[in-house]
UniProtKB/Swiss-Prot annotation:
The keyword Cytoplasm applies. It comes from Helicobacter pylori (strain HPAG1). The gene is panB. InterPro entries: Pantoate_hydroxy_MeTrfase (IPR003700), Pyrv/PenolPyrv_kinase-like_dom (IPR015813), Pyrv_kinase-like_dom_sf (IPR040442). Belongs to the PanB family. GO terms for biological process: pantothenate biosynthetic process. It is an enzyme of class 2 (transferase). The active site is at E187. 3-methyl-2-oxobutanoate binds at D50, S51, D89, K118. This is 3-methyl-2-oxobutanoate hydroxymethyltransferase.
Length: 270
């Protein structure tokens, strides 16, 4: 008689770290309860990303996202998804110093059911990561292409193309791991250095536009499901023509209304 493993009720950091070199971590973004509930049984990690400022609020970058905004959407995601490990982005300016970072990270933990917070930056953030973890906050690091630095960088630029950048990325990864980061997001870095970092550090790496050798992958759900056709990053694979499917359904609905075919007798009360 074979023993069946009981389904995991809630994915924890320990579960994710146990996947290192064993099984790929599946991650996706979500910003509301509806989609979080749909994604719940299919993914390990849901990121409530400040990317919502672009994909949800139609802004040019993530910089105007606020703590209030992130709390609102994190609460919604936590209401819809019960099993995945839920990470909340710390928005631009919310961790500019230790006092501010502690205040906002603790607020996230008190007001939502988020599993962890994510912040951008390399070894210069190591002391802050250590301070947060000492207070019981799980921190996810984020290095490489960092959207909160897009104006400083002059655009969305791939990192790791030269030896100097590769050395810095590895130093950043090792420093964040030593400081206590539980996971590390690698965004927009060349495949060889992403592979090196993944091999050198003991915590899992989750890649976005950083090659297949990371311990897991994440995509913005609206990119992956084909809801934006104005611009598609090279690293995005569309698994659905979502915009086209929804528009066709709305056209059919509008046509039925105009022709008097909706509602019909079965859809009406008497």
């Amino acid at each position: 008689m074979s023993m069946q493993t009981a389904p995991i009720k809630k994915i924890t950091l320990n579960h994710l770290q146990a996947k290192k070199n064993q099984e790929k971590i599946i991650a996706i973004t979500a910003y509301d309860a509806l989609f979080a509930q749909i994604f719940d049984p299919l993914v390990d990690v849901i990121l409530v990303g400040d990317s919502l400022n672009m994909s949800f609020f139609n802004q040019n970058d993530t910089l105007s996202a606020s703590v209030k905004m992130m709390l609102y959407h994190t609460k919604a995601v936590c209401a819809g998804a019960k099993t995945p490990f839920i990470i909340t982005d710390m928005p631009f300016g919310s961790y500019k110093d230790e006092k501010t970072a502690l205040k906002n990270a603790i607020r996230v933990y008190k007001e939502t059911q988020a599993s962890a917070i994510k912040l951008e930056g390399g070894k210069e953030k190591a002391k802050l990561v250590k301070t947060l973890t000492n207070e019981g906050v799980i921190v996810v690091g984020h290095i490489g292409l960092m959207p909160q630095f897009v104006r400083l960088d002059g655009g969305y630029k791939i990192k790791g193309k030269n030896e100097e950048q590769q050395k810095k990325l590895l130093e950043d990864a090792l420093s964040l791991e030593e400081a206590g980061a539980g996971l590390l997001v690698l965004e927009g870095i060349t495949t060889p250095i992403a592979q090196t970092i993944t091999q050198k550090i003991k915590i899992p790496t989750i890649g976005i536009g950083s090659g297949k050798d990371c311990d897991g992958q994440i995509l913005v759900w609206s990119d992956m499901l084909g809801f934006f056709d104005s611009f598609k990053p090279k690293f995005v694979r569309e698994y659905l023509k979502g915009k086209e499917l929804v528009q066709n359904a709305i056209k059919q609905y509008a046509d039925d209304v105009k022709k008097g075919n909706f509602p019909n007798e079965l859809e009406s009360y008497h």
